[in-house]
Each structure stands twice: as structure tokens, then as C-alpha cells.
């Protein structure tokens, strides 16, 4: 690593709230990531005193199409976005891996993390606990990527009480009635869970439609059209990070 690049990275880390930077901290950023973060700083895209760009919060009722739209975003900009790995007390489903899909922990461990203030947001659904830790988000943003948080309205309300300062996007169906067939099509939901999800969907949509709660609200009647709206919202932020538009490494 050249002295010039080393000092550039040191400057970036100091600007992002670090008073000291060890050699291991500095080498964690590639030259491309350092340039991206420098561009972000110049264009106001850095997240306050946090290291890295502002995260992206995606919210909406289950079955509204968040995952499909999010997948199109990450497929197009492969090296621009990263996902935080949430904690949960539920058991792993077939094909899920600890540390990849979720951090699977016991209820006692989860409660201890809550008491320690480790979570930016946490909630209980279907008798299971879910939470997003600050460390999980920082692990992504420290690499110069935009961290995506896929959370519910309760989580959004909690995040708004923190200093995370993300962009908030709400994705909703045209009608609440559209959600039930989508949930059933998954084949992973029980009758009870479907009823629970539908019962809260109307309240979530009401919160999403309230002016000021989200930066943009997308009504998902067509995946391609909805993705175009999300892409248009995020593109200036992506450009400001100076990351290759095709997601290729420099």
C-alpha cells in the first residue's frame, strides 16, 4: 500500500469519527472503497459521525414485494449494497445458515443483548424475537457499501429514535387484499401467521402513507415499475459514492 493511499484512508477514518486508526483498520478498505467514501464525503452522503454511507431501510407489509424489488437492486449494483445479518431466537429453516441468513441465538442471549443496548431495533413476532444490531450495520458500512435493512414498521419507529440516519423507503400493495394470495404462495406461512400478518398490514400501510414517515412511498402494482422508482431514488446516492454502476470491482 502506498503512503499516499494509507494517509488518504487515515483521513477518511478520522473524518468519520475515528480519533485513531490502526493499520488493520486502514487495510480493511480497498482503494476503490476509499475513493467511494471520499466521494461520499464530498457529496454529503456519509452518515454523520458513522463510518460509511447512509443505510437504506426498506419497509412494508409481508407480501408487498420488498424482497423481489430489493433483489433487483442488489443484482444490478452488486458491489454497492450489503445486508445486515439480524439476530433471531427462532429455529433455522431448511437451507438457512447461522451468520449468513440470521444469527440464531437463544432467548437468554437475545435478552442479554437487549439489556446491553446492542440492538438498533428489535421486535417480537409469532413468539420469536428479531433484532438488528449496530455492529451488524457497521460491518457493512465500514466497507463503503450501503447497508440495507429490511424491517417492519415497529423497527422503523425504533430506528428513528437512534442516530443511524438512514434513507427510509416504504413499499405497499395496491390493496391489502392482494397480500393474502402472495403469502399463501410462499408455502412457508401457517394459517395463524397469515392471519397475524394481514391483521397488522392495514396499520402498517396507514403509517407508511403518513407524510414525513418515509422519504419515498412506492405502490407495488408492477415489480419493474416499482424497481424503477426505487432505482431513481437511489441512483443519485449511488453516483455520489462513485461506485461502478455495474457493480464491478475496480
Walk through the language-model features, giving the residues of each.
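Extreme N-terminal, non-catalytic leader segments
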Residues: 2-55
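P-loop (Walker A) phosphate-binding loop of NTP-binding proteins
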Residues: 59-61
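Conserved lysine of the Walker
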Residues: 66
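Post-Walker A alpha-helix
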Residues: 69-71
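Short beta-strand-centered segment that lines the nucleotide-binding/catalytic pocket of NTP-utilizing
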Residues: 78-92
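ATP-dependent NMP and nucleoside kinases share a basic, alpha-helical "lid"
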Residues: 80, 108-118, 132-187, 234-235
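Conserved P-loop
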Residues: 94-112
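Small-molecule kinase domains that catalyze NTP-dependent phosphoryl transfer to phosphate-bearing small molecules
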Residues: 188-236, 243-250
Amino acid at each position: 500500500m502506498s503512503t499516499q493511499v494509507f494517509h488518504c484512508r487515515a483521513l477518511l477514518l478520522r473524518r468519520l469519527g475515528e480519533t485513531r486508526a490502526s493499520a488493520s483498520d486502514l487495510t480493511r478498505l480497498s482503494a476503490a472503497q476509499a475513493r467511494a467514501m471520499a466521494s461520499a464525503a464530498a457529496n454529503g452522503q456519509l452518515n454523520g459521525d458513522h463510518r460509511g454511507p447512509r443505510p437504506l431501510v426498506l419497509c412494508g407489509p409481508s407480501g408487498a414485494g420488498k424482497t423481489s424489488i430489493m433483489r433487483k437492486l442488489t443484482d444490478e449494483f452488486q458491489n454497492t449494497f450489503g445486508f445486515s445479518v439480524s439476530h433471531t431466537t427462532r429455529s433455522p429453516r431448511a437451507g438457512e445458515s447461522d451468520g449468513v441468513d440470521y444469527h440464531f441465538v437463544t432467548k437468554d442471549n437475545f435478552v442479554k443483548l437487549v439489556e446491553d443496548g446492542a440492538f438498533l431495533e428489535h421486535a417480537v413476532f409469532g413468539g420469536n424475537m428479531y433484532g438488528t444490531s449496530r455492529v451488524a450495520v457497521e460491518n457493512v458500512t465500514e466497507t463503503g457499501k450501503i447497508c440495507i435493512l429490511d424491517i417492519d414498521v415497529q423497527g422503523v419507529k425504533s430506528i428513528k429514535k437512534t442516530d443511524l440516519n438512514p434513507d427510509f423507503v416504504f413499499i405497499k400493495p395496491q390493496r391489502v387484499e392482494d397480500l393474502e394470495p402472495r403469502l399463501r404462495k410462499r408455502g412457508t406461512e401457517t394459517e395463524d401467521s397469515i392471519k397475524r400478518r394481514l391483521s397488522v398490514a392495514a396499520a402498517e400501510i396507514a403509517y407508511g402513507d403518513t407524510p414525513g414517515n418515509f422519504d419515498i412511498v412506492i405502490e407495488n402494482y408492477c415489480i419493474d415499475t416499482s424497481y424503477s422508482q426505487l432505482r431513481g431514488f437511489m441512483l443519485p446516492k449511488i453516483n455520489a459514492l462513485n461506485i461502478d454502476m455495474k457493480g464491478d470491482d475496480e
